[in-house]
Amino acid sequence: MISSFAKRVAISIISASTIGLVNPAQAASAKMNATPVNETKFAVVAAPIRGSGRSQLQIYEQVSSERACFSKNGTSVDPLLVSFDFTNICRRYIDSNGYSVRIGDRDYTATYSLNIRRNGNELLLVATPSRPDVGPELEVARANGNGDGFVSLTLNAGW
C-alpha cells in the first residue's frame, strides 16, 4: 500500500538528495515530482538526542533486501542500520537536507521546519512556522502511544 505521506516523504527525500548535486540557483528553482513508493520500506522515527530528553526526526529507507535496516515492534523502532555499514543497503535522512514540508505542489522548506514535540505522554511531529505570518503550526504525525528510545511515528491523514 502506498500512502500519500510516503509519496511526499520519498519525493522530498529524493528531490533533496538530487538537488544537492546541482548548483544553488538550479536547486532553488527545481520542482519536486510525485513518485509512488512502497511505504513499508520507510520508518518515520522520533530518535532520542543523547542526554537532552528531546527527540529529532529521522527517516530510514530500506534500499536493498541484503540486510534489514530497521525493525518495528509496536511503537518501538530498532535502528539496525547503526550496527553495520549500510552503504547501498539503507538510507537515513536526519535533517532538512533529507526532508521538507510540502503541501500540494508547494515546498515550504524556507517557512516551516519539522520538529518532534512531547504533548503529555505522546510524541508529535509538527511543522513549525518560522514566522507568525506564515501560518499555524501543523501536526504531521504522532507516536500513537507512549514510548522511549526510538519511537515509530504514524503520519496523520493527508500527509
Predicted stretch roles:
Residues 9, 17, 52, 65, ...:
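Residues in flexible loops and secondary-structure boundaries
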Residues 8, 16-27:
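C-terminal segment of classical bacterial N-terminal signal peptides
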